[in-house]
C-alpha cells in the first residue's frame, strides 16, 4: 500500500522483518522461524514514525513456548475503520485533493487494501489511451482512461472513490450532509467483482438492502397513485408516465410527497399573466408539486405553534439565515420512464467519443429543447425564443437540479439548496441507467463545485432500476393530460398540457380561469404568503415574479456559472424564456 511506501521513505529505521532476516542464524544451526509477509506489512502500518528508534539485536533463538504463543497482527480489513472526517469530505468535494491521494487516504481511514492496476480500455476507443482500474478489498471498480498513465490513474481513483463515498457511515452523513449532501446509502456493486471475499459478501448484502428499499418505495408510490385515481378511473392510464418525490425519514419511514404525470409541454403563443403551465412532463410536474410541499413545510415552521413547527422538515442553521433540511432526511426521485433528452442516448455511443460517430455522440449529449413531444438540439435555436414558448428537455432540467438544487429561485431566498439523493427508474424496458448517468453526471465535472457559491455543489445521486409502478401504453385518449398532487391535497388536478390550463372535469379547480395550482402566479402567491409569515420585512411587497427571483443572489450566480459551463463545454446554450412572462405581479 501507498501508506507503507510513504512510511519507508520518511524513516531510516529498518523494518522488523528486515532486522529479523539479518540477525537470524543459518537455518542449519538454529530453529527456523516462519516469517510472513503479513508481519512486515502490519508492522509498517502500525509503527509510528516518531523519528527515533531503539534497535535491539535479535538472535532468533527463541524458546519454543514463545514461538507457540506468538500473535500474528491482524490484517488491515479486520482493523476497526475510522470515521471519514468532514474536512476530508469538504476538500475532496471542492477539488482540493488529488483523486489518487484522496483514495489512498480514504482506504487508510477505512482499513482497506487498495491497488491501481492497468487494464484494457472500454468501448471502441481508438488512439493511444491508457486504462486503469482501482481494486479495493478485492473488488474491481470502473475503468478510468487517459492520454497518459497519470491521467488514467486519476480518473480510475475518482470513479472508485465516488462509489465508495456512497456508503459512508449513516451517522456521519446524517450529521454532516447538510453542507455536503452526501448519499448515506452503500455503493452499487462494482462492475467486475473478484473472488468471494468477505468484503464482497458485505457489499452485496448492503446493495441488496438498498434494492429492497427502492422496490418498497416503488410499491408505496403505486399504492398512493392508485388511491388518488380510484374515484376517477378515466385517468388511471396517465400513470404510465408517473414521476414522484419521496422523503425518507430516519432510514425507516418513507412518504410520497409529490406526484406528477404527463408527456407534453405548452407550445402556443406567449402569455404574460403567469397563469399558463409551460412544461407538463411528469418529472417537471412532480418537481413543481414538490415546491408546493416545501411552501407548506415553511408555513408550518413559521406558524409559531411548537407542535406544527416540529412537524416541518426544515430547521434553522447557525451562522446563516437560510433554513436547511432536518437531519436524517433523504429525497428520492422516482420516474416510470427515462427522462426525454440525452438520458435516452445509446450509452455505447457515448462511451466512444473518439470513434467515427463522435459528431453524433456530441449531438446527443448536447442540451435539447422539447418541441411538441420531440427533442431538438438547442444549438438549432437562438439564445431566446420569442414567439412560441418551448422548454428545455427533462434530462437537461434534471442535470441542472444536480447543481442548483430542486428548490428553485424563490425558495432559495429561504432555504439552502435541496439535492436528490437517489434516482429510481421503474421502466421495464430500461436495462441499465448508463445513459442517464452519462447525461446527468458526466456532462458536469466535480471541479465546478469550487467555483459555486456557498452551499452549492455538483451533486452525484445514486441511480437504480426497480419494478415499474405502471406499464407504459400507447393509448392516445389522455395523451395530453397531466396529473399533479402534493401531500396535503384532497385530490388530483388534471391539466391539459397543450393549453397549459386545468380541464373542466378536473377533480380540483382553482377558479373560473382554470389556472393550474402549479403555475407561476400560484407560486408567487405562496412566496408572498411565506414572506409575510416569516416577517422578512427587508423583502419589499408588490414584487413581480421576475423581481422576486432576482433576490436569490447566490442561486442566480450559480445558475449563470452553470449556463456558462454548458456553453464552454460545447453542450450549447440554455434557452431562456422571454422576460415578459415573469413581469406579472399579484
From Swiss-Prot:
Major localisation: nucleus
Superkingdom, natural source: Eukaryota
InterPro entries referenced in this protein's UniProt entry, alphabetically: A_deamin, ADAD1_DSRM, dsRBD_dom
Positions of the UniProt region annotated as Disordered: 183-203
Any one Gene Ontology cellular component term annotated for this protein: cytoplasm
PROSITE patterns on file: A_DEAMIN_EDITASE, DS_RBD
GO molecular function: double-stranded RNA adenosine deaminase activity; double-stranded RNA binding; tRNA-specific adenosine deaminase activity
Keywords: Developmental protein, Differentiation, Nucleus, RNA-binding, Spermatogenesis
One Gene Ontology term from the biological process aspect of the record: adenosine to inosine editing
Location within or outside the cell: Nucleus
Domain DRBM: 98-166
Classification via SMART domains: ADEAMc (SM00552), DSRM (SM00358)
Ranges of residues in domain A to I editase: 258-584
Family membership noted in the UniProt record: Belongs to the ADAD family.
Role played: May be required for male fertility and normal male germ cell differentiation. May play a role in spermatogenesis. Binds to RNA but not to DNA.
Protein name, as recorded: Adenosine deaminase domain-containing protein 1
Species of origin: Xenopus laevis
Gene transcribed to yield this protein: adad1
